[in-house]
């Protein structure tokens, strides 16, 4: 074990040593860079931009580009990369994860590898967790990019897009020409306060944003945006009917900020483009009432560990009587099982003010990792409707899926993927296994002096909360600021009530008060401030210490229980002790906490029985501390297995998705002829194999199978050779297709593309719907000791082939039966597509679970 640890640290140390040598060479270029004009630095970038033949050539320019970026940052934004920030940049350039502590300046770190990789003249994506950070970071770092001749775009979840530009172009041009510098010549310190910045340079290099089309934002050198919007744009690009409507420029290089949050915490959350379904709201109410009549452990079992519900034999019999059916698991009754299990989950596994809140008559999901409300997101598969029935709020229509992809498979499309976070090392195995990314721990610029105390463990939740209140009271009396981290809204409000009774002034930050987040966080480090927060205080915020707080020991972090992941605990601790500041952290635990109760079980209780201690006193026992860590590792392992399992399922779909999207791209970029030729071949071959195998050929069956195009195919029953018969039919259909093209002339291409793309999309949509039912059924089969992934592969393979055959047949028959009519078929299709919306599916159990073209096209009608 020790040997393995040593190996890990050695590996990290080797990586850092290599990077330090490169940084030493960059530092040697520093003096020369100081004397280089803006124009010369920009010329260097533009000289090589688009001229490199392969990505490996970038390394030849790394030192010079990094030196120029550092100097440009010093002059335009008054920030100079520390050596450790350059090390972080080197790690990002290599397609790895840079683990950097809070306050180490990750935003600035990304600039050097972005400018370097821009030499490939391909769009680079910087991925953030929310719109605010995307806009802030793009504008904050914008002057660096603009000064070096790069364009900066921003996309956000409202569908709007922007480009960063100089606020006063004439003044900026003057500043660049005369080499203005925000950093004063006579200042050699490390940090530059706003008061010390050279005013004329600050004014010259101020930026603004202008609204542009999303397509234009993607044509910039670097585009900042959220993970969900990048993913949705990819899906929307694969629903368009015109190449001009595509916005993305491929997937070359992405730098993911808060990479653990996006690639791990959200990995169970597929992106889905959906539209409304036809399920009636009364159905959900009906099954909710039935579910309330079922008794736990008698009619069903609840598995909290895996967050699922399983009907018992007695429960199945009871439901069969109640619903008046002979066999609940008959395919005809699959919807009943689906509604019952969703209702049971809504009642027993999804808790108000923990998993969701009810606000203005709506059920709003709360992100379990950040504590933030996720507006617009809904659980899929009818689960959200089941919760709405439980809460007695209006039930919204269930949705049907048009396109979907997991974050895992979306981000694996990038040729080079890198990430930054304060907490990644504990998940290194997963990053490597799923994304092929190594984690490199970057040294801090200043030593970390925060004190992390041992856990205090209590027998009951009540004892724990009393101890927390006492600790807060003691620290508050001396003026030390305290940030208390809770795991749910419910618990944050309970603690708030206790503090009110004690007369301790405090502020609460949870999903209900998220509008005040920036204001609350800004005050959290001030003297005497007490802040209670859910996980949402853990990311994208910087807590600065107020006057006199360092002398009091800095910010105290109190954790009220351990999270399922050690990484989330580390994020909470990381709010204190930034940039060498003093600070403390301590966790108060109870053996009744959810994590201990669900996963620790008897082992923790046995240790408790061994320890004799007075009520209200904390327990110190090395075995107990070790057990808690084992419990967290166990849960991390379970969650990793779930994510890996989901990836295996989605990877089957991913191959099929790429095939479908490949067909679409070929049709959009070229013409429809190749696809139709393939469709005719496959369609005819399948019919020949079906009806002309064996001794007796089924001529009648063969004729009927071509009924939809009977006007164009005459079956010659005199041909007794299968291959000749096939070729004869193919030639007849191909000739009919050629004549149809001639009839329509130049209009045909637009019409044919539109029809075939819509057929592909509709069949793919139906296929995705069927796949969801397969996922549900194989989850049940997994209880019967069958490998669910293997079962899934088998079933979807045949289903996909059937779907493709339907697509081929429909494409051929629709095009051959085309005739000119002045109607609004296409406009109706567009109206239907306009109903399509984007949702974000929670997809827990297995895990639980377009854009219109602006071009005018010829009118058409399908004759069948």
Curated annotation (Swiss-Prot):
GO cellular component: cell envelope Sec protein transport complex; cytosol; plasma membrane
Origin: domain of life: Bacteria
GO BP field: intracellular protein transmembrane transport; protein import; protein targeting; protein transport by the Sec complex
Localization terms from the record: Cell inner membrane; Cytoplasm
Residues given in the record as ATP binding sites: 85, 103-107, 542
Primary enzyme class: translocase
Catalyzed chemical reaction(s): ATP + H2O + cellular proteinSide 1 = ADP + phosphate + cellular proteinSide 2
A matching Pfam family: SecA_PP_bind
GO molecular function, one term: protein-exporting ATPase activity
Cited InterPro entries: Helicase_ATP-bd (IPR014001), Helicase_C-like (IPR001650), P-loop_NTPase (IPR027417), SecA (IPR000185), SecA_CS (IPR020937), SecA_DEAD (IPR011115), SecA_motor_DEAD (IPR014018), SecA_preprotein_X-link_dom (IPR011130)
EC number: 7.4.2.8
Annotated PROSITE patterns: SECA, SECA_MOTOR_DEAD
Keyword Cell cycle among UniProt keywords: no
Annotated family: Belongs to the SecA family.
Primary role: Part of the Sec protein translocase complex. Interacts with the SecYEG preprotein conducting channel. Has a central role in coupling the hydrolysis of ATP to the transfer of proteins into and across the cell membrane, serving as an ATP-driven molecular motor driving the stepwise translocation of polypeptide chains across the membrane.
Protein name per its UniProtKB record: Protein translocase subunit SecA
Source species: Fervidobacterium nodosum (strain ATCC 35602 / DSM 5306 / Rt17-B1)
Name of encoding gene: secA
């Amino acid at each position: 074990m020790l040997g393995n640890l040593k190996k890990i640290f050695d590996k990290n140390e080797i990586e850092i040593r290599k990077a330090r040598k490169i940084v030493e060479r960059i530092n040697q270029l520093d003096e020369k860079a100081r004397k280089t004009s803006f124009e010369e630095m920009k010329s260097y970038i533009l000289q090589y931009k688009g001229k490199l033949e392969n990505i490996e050539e970038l390394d030849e320019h790394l030192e010079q580009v990094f030196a120029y970026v550092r100097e440009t940052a010093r002059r335009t934004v008054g920030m100079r990369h520390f050596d450790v920030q350059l090390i972080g940049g080197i790690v990002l350039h290599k397609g790895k994860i840079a683990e950097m502590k809070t306050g180490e300046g990750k935003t600035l770190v990304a600039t050097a590898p972005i400018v370097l990789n821009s030499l490939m003249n391909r769009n680079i994506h910087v991925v953030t967790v929310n719109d605010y950070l995307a806009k802030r970071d793009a504008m904050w770092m914008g002057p660096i990019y603009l000064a070096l001749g790069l364009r900066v775009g921003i996309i956000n979840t409202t569908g709007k897009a922007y480009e960063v530009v100089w606020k006063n172009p004439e003044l900026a041009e003057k500043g660049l020409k005369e080499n203005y510098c925000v950093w004063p010549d006579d200042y050699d310190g490390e940090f530059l306060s706003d008061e010390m910045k050279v005013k004329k340079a600050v004014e010259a290099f101020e930026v603004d944003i202008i609204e542009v089309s999303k397509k234009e934002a993607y044509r910039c050198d670097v585009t900042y945006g959220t993970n969900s919007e990048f993913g949705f744009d990819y899906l929307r690009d694969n629903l368009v009917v015109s190449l001009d409507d595509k916005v993305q420029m491929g997937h070359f290089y992405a730098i993911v900020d808060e990479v653990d949050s996006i690639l791990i915490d959200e990995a169970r959350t597929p992106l889905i483009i959906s539209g409304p379904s036809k399920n009636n709201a009364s159905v959900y109410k009906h099954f909710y009432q039935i579910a309330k009549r079922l008794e736990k452990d008698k009619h069903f079992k609840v598995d909290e560990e895996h967050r699922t519900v399983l009907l018992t034999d007695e429960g199945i019999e009871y439901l069969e009587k109640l619903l008046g059916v002979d066999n609940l698991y008959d395919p005809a009754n699959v919807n009943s099982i689906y509604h019952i299990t969703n209702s049971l989950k809504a009642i027993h596994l999804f808790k108000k003010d923990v998993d969701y809140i009810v606000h203005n008559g709506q059920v709003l999901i709360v992100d379990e990792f950040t504590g933030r409300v996720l507006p617009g997101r809904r659980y899929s598969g009818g689960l959200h409707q089941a919760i709405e029935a439980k809460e007695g709020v209006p039930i919204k229509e269930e949705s049907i899926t048009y396109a979907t992809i997991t974050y895992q498979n979306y981000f694996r499309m990038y040729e080079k993927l890198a990430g930054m976070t304060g907490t990644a090392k504990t998940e290194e195995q997963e990053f490597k296994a799923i994304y092929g990314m190594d984690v490199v721990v970057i040294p801090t610029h200043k030593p970390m002096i925060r004190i992390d105390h041992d856990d205090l463990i209590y027998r009951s939740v009540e004892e724990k909360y009393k101890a927390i209140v006492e600790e807060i009271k003691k620290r508050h009396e001396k003026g030390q600021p305290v940030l208390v981290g809770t795991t749910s809204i419910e618990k944050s409000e309970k603690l708030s009530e206790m503090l009110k009774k004690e007369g301790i002034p405090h502020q609460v930050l949870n999903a209900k008060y998220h509008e005040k987040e920036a204001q609350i966080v800004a005050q959290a480090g001030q003297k005497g401030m007490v802040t209670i927060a859910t996980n949402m205080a853990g990311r994208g915020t910087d807590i600065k210490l107020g006057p006199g707080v360092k002398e009091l020991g800095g910010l105290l972090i109190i954790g009220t229980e351990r999270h399922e992941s050690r990484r989330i605990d580390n994020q909470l601790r990381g709010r204190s002790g930034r940039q060498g500041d003093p600070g403390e952290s301590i966790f108060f635990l109870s053996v009744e906490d959810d994590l201990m109760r669900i996963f620790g079980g008897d082992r923790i209780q046995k240790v408790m029985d061994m320890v004799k201690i007075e009520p209200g006193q904390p327990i110190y026992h090395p075995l107990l501390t070790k057990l808690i860590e084992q419990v967290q590792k166990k849960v991390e392992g379970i969650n990793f297995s779930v994510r890996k399992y989901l990836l295996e399922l989605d990877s089957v779909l991913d191959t099929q998705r790429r095939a479908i999207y490949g067909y679409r791209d070929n049709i959009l970029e070229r013409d429809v002829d190749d696809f139709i030729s393939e469709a005719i071949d496959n369609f005819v071959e399948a019919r020949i194999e079906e009806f002309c195998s064996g001794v007796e050929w089924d001529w009648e069956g063969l004729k009927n199978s071509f009924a939809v195009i009977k006007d164009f195919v005459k079956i010659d029953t005199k041909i007794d050779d299968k291959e000749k018969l096939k070729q004869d039919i193919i030639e007849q259909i191909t000739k009919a297709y050629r004549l149809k093209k001639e009839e329509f002339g130049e209009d045909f291409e637009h019409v044919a593309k539109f029809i075939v793309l819509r057929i592909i999309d509709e069949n793919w949509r139906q296929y995705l719907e069927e796949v969801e039912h397969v996922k549900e059924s194989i989850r049940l089969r997994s209880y019967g000791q069958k490998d669910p992934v293997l079962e899934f592969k088998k079933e979807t393979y045949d289903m996909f082939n059937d779907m493709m055959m339907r697509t081929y047949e429909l494409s051929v028959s629709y095009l051959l039966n085309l005739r000119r009519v002045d109607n609004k078929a296409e406009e109706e299709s567009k109206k239907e597509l306009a109903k399509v919306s984007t949702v974000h599916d929670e997809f827990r159990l297995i895990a639980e679970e377009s854009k219109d073209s602006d071009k005018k096209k010829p009118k058409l009608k399908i004759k069948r």
